[in-house]
Each structure stands twice: as C-alpha cells, then as structure tokens.
C-alpha cells in the first residue's frame, strides 16, 4: 500500500523559498505568476495495515516527524 503525504506551510507563515522562486520566475519572464508556496511531498510504502489503525499511524508519523505542525499542515492520500 502506498501513502502520499503533502506537507505545506500554514496560511500566514512567511515562505522565503517560495518568494525566491517567484522572483526567479519573474526574472525568466513568467510575470503572470502571482505567488509560489513551497512544500514537501513524501511517499510511504506500507505493509498491510487496516482502517483506523492505518489512519492513526499516518497521523502519528506526520505529527512526530514528517511535519512541523507548529508552522506546517499535512494531508495524505492512501492508494491500496
């Protein structure tokens, strides 16, 4: 089973990397770009875990390690 985890900065948190990428895109002529936010994409391959235990484990992994929940949000998708 595969789990895709998306980690993004919370609204209102300054994203200096996103601002630098936006500036570079404008320099390259992509002036229509209004904003850039940079995040993380993580793929997990898991053995068989079912139902509530699976959700619980994924949330625990994100809260303990994969995301800094003070400044980041996360969401995930499960592909069985």
Can you describe what each PLM-predicted range is?
Residues 42-46:
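Short, well-ordered beta-strand segments in beta-rich or mixed alpha/beta enzyme
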């Amino acid at each position: 089973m595969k789990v895709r985890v998306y980690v993004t900065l919370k609204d209102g948190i300054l994203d200096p990397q996103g601002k630098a990428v936006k500036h570079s895109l404008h320099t390259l002529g992509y002036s229509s770009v209004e904003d850039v936010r940079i995040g993380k994409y993580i793929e997990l391959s898991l053995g068989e875990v079912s139902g509530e235990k699976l959700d619980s484990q994924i949330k625990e992994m994100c809260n303990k390690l994969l995301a800094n929940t003070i400044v980041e949000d996360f969401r995930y998708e499960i592909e069985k």
